Amino acid sequence: MELQVKPKSKKWRGNFGLYFSLPILSWAFYDFANTIFSSNINTIFFPFFLQEQIGENAVLDQIASTFISYANAIASLFLVLFSPLFGVMIDRTGKMKKYIMIFTLISVVCTFLMGVFGGAPFDGKLLGIPTSLAIVILLFVIAKFFYHSSLVFYDTMMSDLGTKQQLPLISGFGVAVGYLGTLVGLSIYPFISKGSSHEAFIPTAILFLVFSLPLFFFLKESPKQQKAKQPFLSGYKEIKSTFKEMQSYRLVFTFMIAYFFLNDAIATTIGMMAVYAKTVVGFSSSGFILLYLVSTVSSIAGSFLFGYITQSKGPRLAVTYVGVLLLVALFIAVFAQTALWFWVAGSMFGISLGSMWVTSRTYIIELTPDEKRGQFFGLFAFSGKVSSIIGPLLYGTITLVFHDLGTLASRMALGSLIIMAVIGLGFLLKMKGLEEVN
């Protein structure tokens, strides 16, 4: 049975009824599912796996950091190339769930195969890298690309789930449910053998698939009028023309620039925090898992809190508050000499991470006209994913060039993200004047 998404025509009886309607709950469970992938693969076990395969001392740990950074950057590069087309596909076909399903299944299969090849005893090397390791890195790039591609369609789907007043709460609920997925994902950790992080890949793929099923089966999109078919490359031409309309959409583009730099700091930190905590601050694997759980609880609390802050103060101020919190968290992490200070930084980063998705998704919906929403979400992803190339490339290059300095190289790399956060905050402050003019 599929349920039509038409909450706008219903009178909700309080927030409980809003959150636990089957369409919205099914939508939120996909956040639950993809967060399992994000936390288990992107943040924890893939970095652990590379450190196990490459890192043997402080110098080689920096090389492992470079591999992690560059793999993330390559996945983001492909997303940059395709995300503008995805936005145009949404506007012209009106179909989102179809592509979410296809992209999710590809990501699930690649994640499963990471587990197969991660434990395979292959001999020989490919481009100077052990064959099994090279295959796992390639599969990670593909899995991450399709995971992020599905989110372009998923985020756009939110605009059909409620009224303008309800969207901040729906967004916050989705993010909070998503981070509960982290807790479920990490439940596999006690069953992973020491030094065998690849054992986490197959269970993660299964969990990702299982918790995606509610969206696949119980959520039906509202019918949308399809636009006339255009040549394949016309999508890029339309994106180019949209950039030329910058004067007409100054608020949108200014926010995308701000998001570019803030997301740079966030995306890079997500990919590197596990190795940084272990090699620089001295956390054990189990110690970092506990830290990540605390950070996740902070994300859940922050996403709910900032849903209400966004509703009461407006999304621009809410995003600004999140940016300041992120800046402070990065500063503490760079200069932390003890685990205690890194616990503080991790908790603050958790709040800012969950809250950034809540506030930014709501803000872009508020700023964009209905007929351009899919296209602007594509550009929104474009801005974020270009930054997801630059941040990891910068981080990985710093650790590569200065690897002889040991852990100081990682502190320098993380310190570069402070500059990005400051620039992003600067553009957010500029938006106050633009809002008054508009």
Q: How should each PLM-predicted stretch be described?
A:
Residues 41-65, 271-288:
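Short amphipathic helix-loop junctions that connect adjacent transmembrane helices
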Residues 81-95, 301-314, 399:
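Helix-to-loop junctions at the C-terminal end of transmembrane segments
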Residues 98-113, 317-332:
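Structural signature of the two symmetry-related core transmembrane helices
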Residues 110-111, 117, 123-150, 341-355:
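Hydrophobic core of transmembrane alpha-helices in multi-pass small-molecule transporters
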Residues 115-118, 207-218, 415-438:
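Multi-pass alpha-helical transporter architecture, strongest
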Residues 168-190, 383-392:
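Glycine-rich segments within core transmembrane alpha-helices of 12-TM secondary carriers
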Residues 190-206, 397-421:
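A membrane-interface helix-boundary motif in multi-pass transporters
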